[in-house]
Design a protein with these regions (language model features):
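Short, surface-exposed, polar/charged, turn-prone segments marking secondary-structure boundaries
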Residues: 20, 141-142, 167-171
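Helical hinge/lid and interdomain linker segments adjacent to catalytic or ligand-binding clefts
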Residues: 68-155
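Aromatic-Pro/Gly-enriched surface loop or interdomain linker
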Residues: 1-106
Length: 176
């Protein structure tokens, strides 16, 4: 959810110079630029320049859809398509399920294939994954920037995360 409705690359004056190309916007990008009520991503900043640290799946997320940009969900569907084509059955376990249920959600599985960008994690997620690996589970890491930033799920509101980027690393804003 960290990238949900991200628009920072459209609000950055120097992005085209950094990327050496013109910005291309999909209709959903144009819509998000004019409809702030759908919220920002944790890569965006508020109008006062402070970073957005909270995101939620409990809102329309317009950049998380099939046939969108080859990023996140769309890239992950390449993995599921490959598994289907190869005749392998699979289940999808979300980060939120791993956070809430820990190692128990992975019990019974021999192999875990990560998504293409497993960047954000909680202590509970890492503990569950580590316990499962210690029990003999095997993991295929198919991503980049994996296990990079720490997040916290809201205790009373499922689907809400907070991300404070205080450690060293590449980021669009620095947490206080």
């Amino acid at each position: 959810m960290a990238y949900a409705n991200s628009g920072r690359h459209f609000r950055n004056d120097s992005v085209e110079m950094k990327q050496f190309r013109c910005t291309q916007m999909a209709l959903s990008d144009c819509f998000l630029q004019t409809h702030s009520e759908y919220g920002l991503s944790t890569y965006d900043t508020h109008s006062d320049g402070s970073g957005v640290s909270v995101s939620s799946r409990l809102r329309p997320v317009l950049n998380l859809r099939p046939r969108g940009r080859v990023w996140g969900l769309v890239a992950d569907t390449h993995i599921t398509s490959w598994l289907e084509h190869a005749g392998h059955s699979f289940d999808v376990v979300t980060d939120e399920e791993l956070h809430a249920e820990g190692v128990e959600v992975l019990d019974g599985y021999r192999v875990l294939v990560t998504g293409t960008h497993p960047e954000y994690h909680t202590t509970e997620m890492l503990d569950g994954l580590d316990a499962w690996l210690q029990r003999g589970g095997r993991m295929i890491y198919s991503g980049a920037n994996g296990f990079y930033w720490r997040i916290a799920y809201h205790a009373e509101k499922p689907g809400v995360i907070e991300c404070r980027k205080t450690e060293g690393g590449t980021r669009s804003w620095v947490s206080e």
